[in-house]
Amino acid sequence: MESQRNILLIGLLFVSFLLWQQWQADKAPQPVAQTQSSVAPSTVADAHSSDVPDADSALPETVTASKELITVTTDQFVLKIDPVGGDIVHSALLSHKLEQDGDDPFVLLEQTNDIYYIAQSGLIGRDGIDSSTTGRAHFDSASREYDLAGQDTLEVPLTYLAANGVTYTKLFTFYRGKHNVDVDYQINNTSDAQLQVQMYGQIKHSIKKSESSMMMPTYRGAAFSTADTRYEKYSFDDMADKNLNKSTLGGWVAMLQHYFVSAWVPPENDKNIIFSSVSAGGLANIGFRGALYDIAPGTEQSIKAQFYVGPKDQEALSALSESLNLVVDYGFLWWLAIPIHWLLMFYQSFVGNWGVAIILITLTVRGMLYPLTKAQYTSMAKMRNLQPKLADMKERFGDDRQKMGQAMMELYKKEKVNPMGGCLPILLQMPIFIALYWVLLESYELRHAPFMLWITDLSVQDPYYVMPILMGVSMFIMQKMQPMAPTMDPMQVKMMQWMPVIFTVFFLWFPAGLVLYWLVGNLVAITQQKIIYAGLEKKGLK
């Protein structure tokens, strides 16, 4: 098959991928929420009888005054905790800047008049201290400012003395180098009656339109995991259509925002209910409810969960739950994207530059495919040499396609030519290209990652469109280097001539890292073509 047709095949596959991707985002079937039977109903409070505070009906007209909040500073973030309920209402990620050259940290959780994104946890049940009807507990704290400083761990205890004389302590534990927080309710039942409580954790997020595009789609919404479903996205539209109500052992819930995630992870051996809701005011809510605990008089009980707020760091997420790293969603080619990501990290650890690491991946891929590439050009050269015989067959058999096809197969067999031999390298390159596309799109490590000169962020488009234009020029050179069959259809010739322009336009808005991969791949292909064609000419093949 002619190389020109291969390039057309690339274009069709590429455009089909983009269209399929957009269709998935807009038209994919909504998942059906079904209650799982892995947990006996008696072990977990009924979803409809729970007293979890609902998502607020609207954004608050005013937010809690900053002087009332408890500020916790570690080496990774600055968190603010509201003493009313002990909710985490603000998180500034110190290692991740809002703007590449700016000083302001990236803020994930925040409670403002425009954006409402908080992590809430509490105790419900007969003796719970948080309720949608009676309100939240007002905790006391020894200080309004806590700093990890030179410590490896930092504990922030909040205390609440209930009317029955029972002391509830909500203990936050922070760790150096980590984005996760332990939230531990310690209940000392000094009363004469048995207590019954249940922990919940939920994430509330105001629904706003995603800023992604067809070329760089990003997901903003919820996700969850159960014993039967390791990972499932649950978009805001899904949440509006139907509330979740799933019983499971362990599990987790999360809110995703491109490179960042917030997640509640209850103990893996606990029996929980995963739930969701959307308020009339536009607040999406996803959370978990744990098992009911009976606390006898004179005893103490600890009920805990972990909360993560930070980048989609696969290693850190896996440490919390073996499936939480799946929030780094590489799509249907995840099995190929994972080794590509590992190789990218490996190269970067040596060279210290993500752009150079992408170049090394390109050289690795092209090197691995070189035997197939050589076979491709050899097959195409043989096919070109067969064109006169194929033209003669067309004249002899006319419109008799059956005889024509049979004669062609006999000719291919006699000349030892595989008419599909030129397609294999193309078909192998496309999955690699798509997998790398998702790696560059999903990997937080490439956010604000510079290359050289004007390319200061490989995760966004080239600001001056230099690389996409160079890529188009390289495609044009490749096209000119490849002999064009005289029998080629005129319409196909026209399409071929426009293909570099079409690709250039497509790549104008692609991440610079992906354009770099394709550009370097083209330059390597041009070099390989010259070497292969020189060898073919010595064998009398042109």
Curated annotation (Swiss-Prot):
Note the topology in the membrane.
Answer: Multi-pass membrane protein
Name this polypeptide is given? Membrane protein insertase YidC
Q: Which UniProt keywords apply?
A: Cell inner membrane, Cell membrane, Chaperone, Membrane, Protein transport, Transmembrane, Transmembrane helix, Transport
Q: Which organism is it from?
A: Shewanella piezotolerans (strain WP3 / JCM 13877)
| Binding partners and assembly | Interacts with the Sec translocase complex via SecD. Specifically interacts with transmembrane segments of nascent integral membrane proteins during membrane integration.
Chief place of localization: membrane
Q: Which residues form a coiled coil?
A: none
GO CC, one annotated term: plasma membrane
**Annotated region Disordered: where?**
32-57
Gene Ontology molecular function: any one: membrane insertase activity
